[in-house]
Amino acid sequence: MSTNLPNSCLVQIALTVSTHSGPQLIYHYPPSNYATATNSKKTHHPDIKKRYEYTDSENNSSSDDYSSGLSDSELSTDYADCSSDASESSLDSLPQSNHEDTVNSSTNNTFINNGLRSRQSQISANKLFQVLNQNNNNVAINGENSLRESLHSIRTSTNMSSTTDPRPEDELDAVDEELKILVDDLLDGSIFQQDTFQDISKVLNFNTEFVAELCSPRKEMCNTRFEFTVDDLCFLGLPIHADHKGRWKKSKKRKQASKRSARSSTARNSISRNSVGRNSIGRNRSKTESQGHINDVEEPADDENSDYEPSKSEMLNEMYCVPDAENDEFESLQQSINMFQVCFIMNPKIIEYNERVDDMYHYVVTRLSLILRYIQGKTGYVTRECVKIMKCKDEVSKHSRYYESLKSPWSKGKYMYERILYESSLARALTKCFNCIHNNEIANLEIDGDKIVSLQIPIKNEFSILPNLKEDAVLRGSFLSSILNESFIGRSTSLTNEDSDNLYANHDRLLDYGLLLLDEPENIIKGLENASFDNGVTDLLLINLVRQLKPTIRLGQYKLLIKELIDSNDSSYDDQFCETTLKSLCLHLIYWRHARLILPISSRNTYIVSPLAPISGFSTDDFKHGEYDTLIRQQEVPVNNNDEPSLIYQNKKVFNEKFPSLPSLPSFLQLMSTQKPRPFGHIIPSNEHKSMYLNALAWLMRYGYLTQLLTFVYVRVDKRIKIAVDEDLEKDNLRSNKHEKSGNFVTGGENYNSSEFDDLEMINDNDFTIILEPERNTALEKRWLYKCAEALPTDLQTLFRQVVKYFNGKVSLEYIMIKEGIPKNEIKRLLQALGKYIVEVKHW
């Protein structure tokens, strides 16, 4: 069992749709066979990911016939009439009804797909210039009639095969280099090899018709969790189905109207019997919601006032488009799609099945499906992209001479995927999603041009309880702490009301902590700049916050920095806005694994060597040797062929370079490993060395060598306190009895008090009682607590009432001092005064 290790168990991702003519498999990735998909080695971090370069061994000889020796820079985009970015954005912004009739079906595909050929497939220079000359002559024709004629000629050239050139004109035009690089990065060359490639007509040895039928459930099974197992594979998804009116999602206005009608029908039902039908509809709706359907899941608000203004090029494309039978077929197909599903195919172990599948569903499947449903309801994005993919497949398989000239099936498969990825942004998003989730990275997907969604399965590298390393290994350098960052992020897609309240409460406590960067600030800033999506304000705030962050300072003190960066003179940016912005930035750094929350580092705190410190092993991901060290040594097999030192000695070199004047890493850890833990300030020689030692402490906590030792407190009530409270209750009871006798009537209070005293007699038999929840204590427990502090001075009694709610064994004293602003000496005085009524627990 290895549930603590990052392993998504994802082997393939598939997009299916359901139409009036039946289900269809639109796209799946990767096209690898069953053996490769289920037995491939998983990489867990980008630093150990290996990149493969594809080489077509069987096609090298044939490629020499039309190789000109021209470099990629010479085959530039100088002859392109318009950029691919502009063309693709114009396609996505066209109305759905006219989208498939536009000029993109021929002309846009011609220059888009040129740059996706392999380097061995470059044609000769003479043929290139001939084609470019012919294209220039066609482009030079002006006027409305000439444009129509050029469109007809291009469509004709697409449908007719050329006898002089193995690659038609539509595969020679210039391409966008950035998009070409993006597609090259998305495709894994190791998949398109003879021993790993699976024919695109099959999905993991299953026929595409079977997978399409399996992943297209009927309407009653849609809009809820879909989970189906075939052999060792799990098909997991969230199928989205349109209603009988073709709506993909109920708008908020329709929801409110339906709720009002349901309430009114219920009210009328009390005075009339003519509303039985309405009541039955209301009962059916409530039954559907109780079954776990997602129609009321909160999604982005609708843009009611958004006005669409097409550009001139889009208007020309729509004006001069020439419909044909093929476009009519795809347009009718687009209009007939009533269901789509992004299905994640997994192969988890039986013992890990529930946890792996639940994590995938909660963190990835639900979020991706909901954002696609929202965009589909707004713009018809999913159906439009499905038609793009199907048209691209049809054009390549039927009209591409270069595709027919390829000999090996894996070469054809790679070329087909290149063309699809270049055409469809949804295919690129699904491919990137698979690559990132498969490698346990964060998938930052751009959907429909302006929608960004980040998906990840959190890596388990933090524990509040020491795991059993013999049964379940963990990553080297995992954090051992009671401050779990996951509790501040939470499962946003599966929060119950109670969990949601706890999550918001954690957000309120967020600014009381410090933030420890998990990498050098320069590296984090570089990563933020590469992952930015032209949001200048957010990038500015994040970069400046990363530069100023220090683990010794509370996050709440950075509100002034946010004010200065935004606009300190603008009255609209109040303290609440700056605080909310600061929380969002901190949560962003935590979610993207750039930082983690800790209590602010101080020389007064106590730190110990973590039991999970990365001492052995050869890398952070080298959990295999941690599990099988003994077995490997018994077999006398070398555990490392490169003769690399273990992690402690690798980090020793880095530590010495960063802190040359401090003791070596093993010596420093030896200083921290005392028999009785002491505050960190005891090992600091002088105040001049304090800053350097605190920086070293932050470095050691970043790599999991040290963890903070916290103090938790319980209140213990002994038998003497119980007897004293019991006597007070008896006195109060006697007074109440005298008052009742003078009134000549008896109430039910005597029976209640007598039963209470019977319970007290049973409780008094115990020596002591620990109050687990002083904030939610009963009346009797409250008397016990006040009795414990009755003999204290007045100032300590006030302090006790202020902090007793935290004495539940869950909130550390170190956090109490930060939260309430209480000096450490005052807390120490209070604990000494309470004496035997306090139970202290040391824990990380």
Swiss-Prot record:
Region spans: Disordered: 53-113, 246-310
Signal sequence residues: 1-21
Keywords: Meiosis, Signal
InterPro entries, per database record: HTH_NPRL3, Npr3
Biased composition (Acidic residues): 297-307
Stated family: Belongs to the NPR3 family.
PANTHER family: CGTHBA PROTEIN -14 GENE PROTEIN (PTHR13153), GATOR COMPLEX PROTEIN NPRL3 (PTHR13153:SF5)
Protein name, per record: Nitrogen permease regulator 3
